[in-house]
Each structure stands twice: as structure tokens, then as C-alpha cells.
Amino acid sequence: MNSGVPATLAVRRVKFFGQHGGEVNSSAFSPDGQMLLTGSEDGCVYGWETRSGQLLWRLGGHTGPVKFCRFSPDGHLFASASCDCTVRLWDVARAKCLRVLKGHQRSVETVSFSPDSRQLASGGWDKRVMLWDVQSGQMLRLLVGHRDSIQSSDFSPTVNCLATGSWDSTVHIWDLRMVTPAVSHQALEGHSANISCLCYSASGLLASGSWDKTIHIWKPTTSSLLIQLKGHVTWVKSIAFSPDELWLASAGYSRMVKVWDCNTGKCLETLKGVLDVAHTCAFTPDGKILVSGAADQTRRQISRTSKSPRDPQT
């Protein structure tokens, strides 16, 4: 993990993103940090200008709640997963649906783009992971191995691997370089409940958040657990590494967001300004803003000010 000195937190409310017609289930920043994407129980995907908070568009099409949304790494596309058993691929510039990916038999709970933006993984209540070709919309592979619903996923930024988390309390790492990845995966065990969220760091560490109220940080290459973070009093809903890997943010159902020191495992800050349930959290690409989503149908941005000894002028 990064051995640098963590910056200090200066917490303040920056702005709200309202106008959702239902609970906010997911949020994601565009790679350049200029746009915020939110998915709602009202079945719509919303696009916001980060700086001003202006609503750019509200996109319908799904016939059920939007459970998850994510930008492609190249910033040209985003994907939305829904209870209607489909994944929709959207063009960012035109705010237009390009294709609907069908194949899941039950609600789709998670989607992830490969680092080159050419493939998309989806998983859900049918216990299956589907790997799609983004350009054609064709399903490339079907990954089977979890014993229960798949709730989370993320691609490794350093190797051609996909991590998936499930209600079976395990994290599976799929080596997509293998011809038959369905039988070529490793399982990370240690949680005692649903793996609700996964997040890779830039260097390839993997964090997993669970309904067992804990967060684990793993080194997937050796299947080793590096550190366990305890402090949430209810389920962990969302996690995010800061770009410098010094901090990890976690959002829970306990009306709070926590910020952790990844090296020591110490909780640096507990942010209690979130109304109702904290659903999601994310850092902007520059690490300056933490976003938390709440069931009160708003988005809240919280600023991060760096005052580390390495940067005394900030």
C-alpha cells in the first residue's frame, strides 16, 4: 500500500444534487471528473455537471429500478444495470441508448468495464457473470461458480482479471486470460455475509465491503488479506479508494460515511451529514471530492483539502 503521509480532511457540504424521483442506488464520476452519473429507484439515469450541480439529462428506458451505473474508462460510454434484467449501454456525448444487453434471467445488480473499455461484465440474482463485447453487444463468456446472487464486480487495472462478490460470502477472481475462466478462478474467503461492494486500487489491491459490517483489503496475487477495517454498525454499501491509495471511503446503511487510513486501518473521519441511508461514495479522479448518495433522493459532495507535510501550502 502507499506509504505516503495522508492528507487531512476538511469536511464541508458543497452542493446537493436533487430531483431524483426515488432512492439513489449508485453514482459514478466520469474519468475527467466533469460529470456525475446517478442511478435511481425511479428507473432513470441522471447526468450532472459536477462543478455547477446542473442536471444535464434524465434518461428513461429501464422498466425497473436502476441498481448500478458506471462510466467506461475512456469516458465515451456508460452502462446501467436494472431490475428489469437488462443492461443498457449509453453514449455520453449524445445521451443516447446504443444497445440493450439481454441474457440475465433476474435483476442485474452490477456492471464493470474492462480497463480498455472494450468489454463489460454484468452480474445479478441469476448467480451468473456475463462478459460482453461493448462494440457489438454480443455475449463473449458466461462465468459460473458463485453459489448465490452476484452483487458486486470490478476489473483489475493491472492484469486481465475480474473480481465478483456474492451473497455466498466469497469474492471470486476470474483470470480472463484463461480459455475456460469458469473453472480458472480463485476464491477469497473471510467475510461472513453478502459482498455488497468491490473496488480495485490503481496498483491492484482489492477492497471488499460486506453486510458483515467489515471491509477487507486484499492482495489478490497472493490471495492474502492485508487488513480488516471494522467500525460500521450496519451493512457496508459502497467503497472507494482515493487515487493515491492513502484513503478508503466507505458508505453504510447507518447514515454515515467513513474515511480510513489504508496503511494503519484507522478510521480518520466519520461523516454524519448524510440524511437517511448512505448508499454510495466515490472520489473524483483528483481525489478532492467525496460523494455520498442517500435515500432522501439527493447527492451530497464533501470536499477534501490536502494539508500533508509534503504539500504545506495547500
From Swiss-Prot:
InterPro entries: G-protein_beta_WD-40_rep (IPR020472), WD40/YVTN_repeat-like_dom_sf (IPR015943), WD40_repeat_CS (IPR019775), WD40_repeat_dom_sf (IPR036322), WD40_rpt (IPR001680)
A Gene Ontology cellular-component term: transferase complex
CDD domains in the record: WD40
Region (Disordered): 294-314
Pfam families: WD40 (PF00400)
WD repeats, residue ranges: 19-58, 61-100, 103-142, 145-184, 190-228, 231-272, 274-312
Record has Repeat as a keyword: yes
Swiss-Prot/TrEMBL keywords: Repeat, WD repeat
An example Gene Ontology biological process: hematopoietic progenitor cell differentiation
Protein name: WD repeat-containing protein 38
Organism: Homo sapiens (Human)
Gene: WDR38
